[in-house]
């Protein structure tokens, strides 16, 4: 799992350099359209120096036009690590020929070997196939056509909307059951499954956004709007139902996201994530602490909510508390006590109305 996270991080870092809208990508696209092919190395360290033969040092500021003109020559272009300077043009690269390569073309085989030998980012632009391939270490990534990525991103957004609707239904139903005091582990796990799927699709959309660069702004806005408050509410859900009250619920949500990236989770995985044994029955009754519901009451800060839960222990305890009992809690006066009672009543009414709509 750690290896997969590192790979994803590496891809994101690479894509930020060559995403649409960046000067480097503009230059690469110009070379692609001209069908001249090209080989670009980012970084000029001792390892790169040892495999560069010939070429001429120009050490000029990078521009898409310069890249396009210099790529017309047969040799490789050596840029600095950030791609802001062109250091060498028409360089002959001589990597170790004993390094394994899955590529068949000379340009791509050289690119793969240079990347494996030096760890530098190497961009190979195909002359005939109109393909841009990125290499870094053992990583190989082929850039897709922007139109294809946009189509996939829009499809993923539509899928996310469906799972967001599943989340909304599940969290509404859970809220009603919480007020009725009949929650079982099954309902909590069902909602966590919808969180898992939302996070899984979110990660896929983020990968498209990184590859789209400036073309992905609208997709990013849609993603932000769809996920507004969902992750914060999911963290409070975990805080409500985790066996240990002191556990860092944000850290557990992050763990859920990491797991969602690598595997489809079983019910027992989610039960264990909440601090219970994996064999715990899904029919077992569970009681919410009340963080999620009380956080919906307007103008009640987190510190006051913490004081409420510390005093009454559960959501049911808060709901049953009288105005005087609420008034006794530190930071809550008579006015705020009434607001809490009214707020809980409004939330309950809203949940029942949502279920019948």
From Swiss-Prot:
Listed Gene3D superfamilies: 5' to 3' exonuclease, C-terminal subdomain, DNA integrity scanning linker region, DNA integrity scanning protein, DisA, N-terminal domain
Residues at which ATP binds: 75, 93, 106-110
UniProtKB keywords: ATP-binding, DNA damage, DNA repair, DNA-binding, Magnesium, Nucleotide-binding, Nucleotidyltransferase, Transferase
Cofactor(s) it depends on: Mg(2+)
Superkingdom of origin: Bacteria
SUPFAM superfamilies: RuvA domain 2-like (SSF47781), YojJ-like (SSF143597)
Domain DAC: 8-146
PROSITE patterns named in the record: DAC (PS51794)
Molecular function in Gene Ontology: adenylate cyclase activity; ATP binding; diadenylate cyclase activity; DNA binding
Gene Ontology terms describing biological process: DNA repair
Cited InterPro entries: DisA, DisA_sf, DNA_integrity_DisA_N_sf, DNA_integrity_scan_DisA_link, DNA_integrity_scan_DisA_N, DNA_integrity_scanning_protein, RuvA_2-like
Presence of the UniProt keyword ATP-binding in the record: yes
Family per record: Belongs to the DisA family.
HAMAP family the record matches: DisA
Quaternary assembly: Homooctamer.
Function per UniProt: Participates in a DNA-damage check-point that is active prior to asymmetric division when DNA is damaged. DisA forms globular foci that rapidly scan along the chromosomes during sporulation, searching for lesions. When a lesion is present, DisA pauses at the lesion site. This triggers a cellular response that culminates in a temporary block in sporulation initiation.
Record protein name field: DNA integrity scanning protein DisA
């Amino acid at each position: 799992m750690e290896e997969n996270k590192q790979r994803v991080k590496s891809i994101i870092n690479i894509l930020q350099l060559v995403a649409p809208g960046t000067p480097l990508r503009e230059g690469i696209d110009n070379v692609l359209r001209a069908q001249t092919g090209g080989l670009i190395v980012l970084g000029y360290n001792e390892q790169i120096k040892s495999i560069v033969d010939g070429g001429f040092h120009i050490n000029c500021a990078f521009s898409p036009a310069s890249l396009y003109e210099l790529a017309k020559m047969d040799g490789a272009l050596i840029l600095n690590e950030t791609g802001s300077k062109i250091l060498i043009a028409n360089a002959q690269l001589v990597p170790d020929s004993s390094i394994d390569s899955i590529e068949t073309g000379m340009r791509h085989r050289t690119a793969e070997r240079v990347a494996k030998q030096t760890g530098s980012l190497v961009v190979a632009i195909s002359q005939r196939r109109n393909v841009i391939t990125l290499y870094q270490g053992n990583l190989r990534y082929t850039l897709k056509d922007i139109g294809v990525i946009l189509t996939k991103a829009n499809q993923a957004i539509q899928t996310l909307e469906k799972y967001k609707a599943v989340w909304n239904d599940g969290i509404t139903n859970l809220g009603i059951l919480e007020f009725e005091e009949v929650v079982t582990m099954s309902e909590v796990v069902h909602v966590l499954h919808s969180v898992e799927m939302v996070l899984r699709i979110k990660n896929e959309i983020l990968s498209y956004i990184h590859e789209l660069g400036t073309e992905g702004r609208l997709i990013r806005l849609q993603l932000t709007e769809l996920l507004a408050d969902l992750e914060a509410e999911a963290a409070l859900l975990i805080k409500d139902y985790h066996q240990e009250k002191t556990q860092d619920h944000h850290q557990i949500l992050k763990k859920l996201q990491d797991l969602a990236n690598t595997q489809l989770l079983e019910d027992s995985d989610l039960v264990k994530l909440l601090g219970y044994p994996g064999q715990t029955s899904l029919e077992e009754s569970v009681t919410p602490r009340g963080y999620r519901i009380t956080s919906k009451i307007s103008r009640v800060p987190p510190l006051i909510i913490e004081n409420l839960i510390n005093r009454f222990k559960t959501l049911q305890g808060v709901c049953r508390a009288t105005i005087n009992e609420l008034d006794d809690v530190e930071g809550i006066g008579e006015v705020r006590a009434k607001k809490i009672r009214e707020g809980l009543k409004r939330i309950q009414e809203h949940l029942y109305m949502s279920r019948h709509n």
